[in-house]
Each structure stands twice: as structure tokens, then as C-alpha cells.
């Protein structure tokens, strides 16, 4: 749970942030 778990969590967080920023950008502009 040291290598794969951390990498997977990081990818998920970045993916969620990307969706939030993308949605805000499309909706705001």
C-alpha cells in the first residue's frame, strides 16, 4: 500500500481537480 496506493490516489486527485477546473472554465467562460 506504499507505492501503488499512493500513485493511484494522486492520479485520482489530479483527475478530479482537472474536471473541476475544466467545468469551471467552460461554465464561467
Swiss-Prot record:
TM stretches of this protein: 8-28
Disulfide bridge map: none
Main subcellular location of this protein, as a coarse class: membrane
A Pfam family annotated for this UniProt entry: YjcZ_2
Subcellular location: Membrane
Topology class, membrane: Single-pass membrane protein
UniProt entry keywords in alphabetical sequence: Membrane, Transmembrane, Transmembrane helix
CC terms in the record's Gene Ontology section: membrane
Similarity comment: Belongs to the SscA family.
UniProt-recorded name of the protein: Uncharacterized membrane protein YczM
Organism: Bacillus subtilis (strain 168)
Gene behind this protein: yczM
Amino acid at each position: 500500500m506504499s507505492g501503488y496506493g499512493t500513485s493511484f490516489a494522486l492520479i485520482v486527485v489530479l483527475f478530479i481537480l482537472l474536471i473541476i477546473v475544466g467545468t469551471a472554465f467552460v461554465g464561467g467562460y
